[in-house]
Regions:
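Conserved class I S-adenosyl-L-methionine
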Residues: 1-42, 56, 60
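Nucleotide donor/acceptor-binding cores
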Residues: 44-46
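Class I SAM-dependent methyltransferase SAM/SAH-binding core
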Residues: 48, 54-98
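A short acidic, Gly/Pro-enriched loop at the edge of an enzyme's catalytic core
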Residues: 99-109
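A short SAM/SAH-binding and catalytic strip from SAM-dependent methyltransferases
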Residues: 108-122
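A short glycine-rich, Lys/Arg-flanked "PGG" loop and its adjoining helix->strand segment in the class I
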Residues: 124-136
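SAM-dependent methyltransferase
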Residues: 141-199
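Conserved Class I S-adenosyl-L-methionine
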Residues: 186, 190-239
Length: 239
């Protein structure tokens, strides 16, 4: 990678844009099947939303009946989360990371899009900590952008202006524009293929129990583009 990595989400304008999102368009597919997967794989009600952003996934888990804590590295995102959900438990994780949380404290940890824009070294640092926080029999659900999302057009995203995405390899920067928000600056993510994710999980002792790739049925009231034939997301269930 030739560009410096920064926390693009520590940006007030982008945080405001994210706060307006619920589950429009392509994002709907990332969350549609989570209740089914949680019911199938998770026992217990203690949850951690790792990389909670503006809190939409935290609220989602609470609506499923979980006692949930949302954590993030972005103060700007957390400010939006607290504004929208004053009763929620949102915590900033700074230099100490997750060290302040008790080992084995969570039956479910959700990381929704948290790993999309971080390099390998940060994934490798975070994954053992998340494993440490899982209760016996607990599950880590990781929702990530599939490699295909950076190659096609979607109801909620565009990549047509970034042909260089096609030659990107694991660890390279890839760009994508969100169409559901006024802020049309490209989001810069770090490509991580399914094979590479599985290597990273295995390296820290996390087993892939299931992997789910959601598709649209075509019956939804959305003008899908690629979503009925190509999955934009992968949901890993780890333990």
């Amino acid at each position: 990678m030739t560009e410096s990595f920064g926390n693009v989400y520590e940006d007030t304008e982008r945080a405001r844009a994210y706060a307006q999102l619920d589950y429009p368009g392509t994002y709907y597919l990332a969350f549609r099947d989570l209740p089914m997967l949680v019911h199938k794989h998770v026992r217990g009600i203690r949850a951690l939303d790792f990389g909670c952003g503006t809190g939409r996934s935290t609220r989602f888990l609470r609506n499923l009946g979980f006692q949930v804590i949302g954590v993030d590295v972005s103060q700007a995102m957390l400010a939006q989360a607290r504004d929208r959900d004053p009763q929620g438990d949102y915590r900033w994780i700074g230099e100490g990371g997750l060290a302040g949380l008790e080992a084995g404290a969570f039956d479910l940890i959700l990381a929704a899009f948290t790993f999309d824009n971080v390099p390998d070294e940060r994934k490798i640092a975070a994954l053992p900590e998340l494993r440490r926080l899982l209760a016996r029999g607990g599950r880590l659900l990781v929702v990530v952008s599939s490699a295909a999302i950076y190659l096609h057009e979607w109801a909620s995203f565009s990549t047509r202006d970034f042909p260089e995405n096609r030659t990107a390899r694991d660890g390279d920067f890839v760009r994508i524009v969100m169409l559901d928000v006024p802020d049309r600056r490209p989001v810069i993510d770090v490509l991580c293929s399914d094979t590479h994710y599985r290597e990273l999980f295995g390296a820290v002792g996390l087993a892939v129990i299931d992997a789910f790739r959601p598709l649209a049925s075509g019956a939804e009231s959305v003008s899908w583009v690629s979503e009925t034939t190509i999955s934009p997301w992968t949901i890993y269930i780890l333990g």
